[in-house]
Amino acid sequence: MMKHRDKPMPENEEPLQEQEGTLHAEPAEPQPQKEDRVAELEAALTAEKEQSGKLRDEVLRRAAEFENFRKQKEREAVQSSLRAKETILRELLPVLDDVERVLANAPEPEAIPVAAKPFIEGVELMKKNLDRWLEEKGVKPIEAIGLKLDVDFHEAISQIEHPEAEPDTIVEQYQTGYLLGDRVIRHAKVIVSR
């Protein structure tokens, strides 16, 4: 039996020392192929950078869209809350008008019977509380008498001759108008001079 060392060498193979010498020879791959490969990799890198830039821009655009959407929803929530508040306040104003009419038509204090005084005082207290509550909510009455008619705040329901007032001056207020912040929730109904 022949050992591995004893095997005869095939004719086409050179001894190991001779093969080692050929390993240090010029590379088999020509230089232009390496340059082509580098150019190919640089092109791929550029394409990836462009794709990355596009994706980054898309992410930034989506983030901006989301931020705008969030702000819009916040504004809508605030507006909805204000509209609900305005609706409630607008529905309360006729009650306040009735309280004012009761007080305006009450007899003079000395003419009020003793038994009726607590009722009148109760209505006055109710008016004070309503006024304070409305003020806390940001509601304030619109000034009218003696001012020029301003259609943003006043609604003229009639005109009368008034010798002491200039034309379009408010001489009488039929119904008080109110503001909620800067927004008119009810125009003041007024009578103006001609």
UniProtKB/Swiss-Prot annotation:
Organism superkingdom: Bacteria
Ranges of compositional bias, category Basic and acidic residues: 21-40
InterPro entries noted in UniProt: GrpE (IPR000740), GrpE_coiled_coil (IPR013805), GrpE_head (IPR009012)
Annotated segments matching region Disordered: 1-53
UniProt entry tagged with the keyword Iron-sulfur: no
Keywords linked to the UniProt accession: Chaperone, Cytoplasm, Stress response
UniProt main location, coarse: cytoplasm
Pfam families: GrpE
Biological process per Gene Ontology, one example term: protein folding
Keyword Cytoplasm included in the entry's annotation: yes
Cellular compartments annotated: Cytoplasm
SUPFAM superfamilies for this protein: Coiled-coil domain of nucleotide exchange factor GrpE (SSF58014), Head domain of nucleotide exchange factor GrpE (SSF51064)
Gene Ontology molecular-function annotations: adenyl-nucleotide exchange factor activity; protein homodimerization activity; protein-folding chaperone binding; unfolded protein binding
Entry GO terms, CC: cytoplasm
Disulphide-bonded residues: none
Family listed: Belongs to the GrpE family.
Assembly notes: Homodimer.
Job of this protein: Participates actively in the response to hyperosmotic and heat shock by preventing the aggregation of stress-denatured proteins, in association with DnaK and GrpE. It is the nucleotide exchange factor for DnaK and may function as a thermosensor. Unfolded proteins bind initially to DnaJ; upon interaction with the DnaJ-bound protein, DnaK hydrolyzes its bound ATP, resulting in the formation of a stable complex. GrpE releases ADP from DnaK; ATP binding to DnaK triggers the release of the substrate protein, thus completing the reaction cycle.
Protein known as: Protein GrpE
The organism of origin for this protein: Chlorobium phaeovibrioides (strain DSM 265 / 1930)
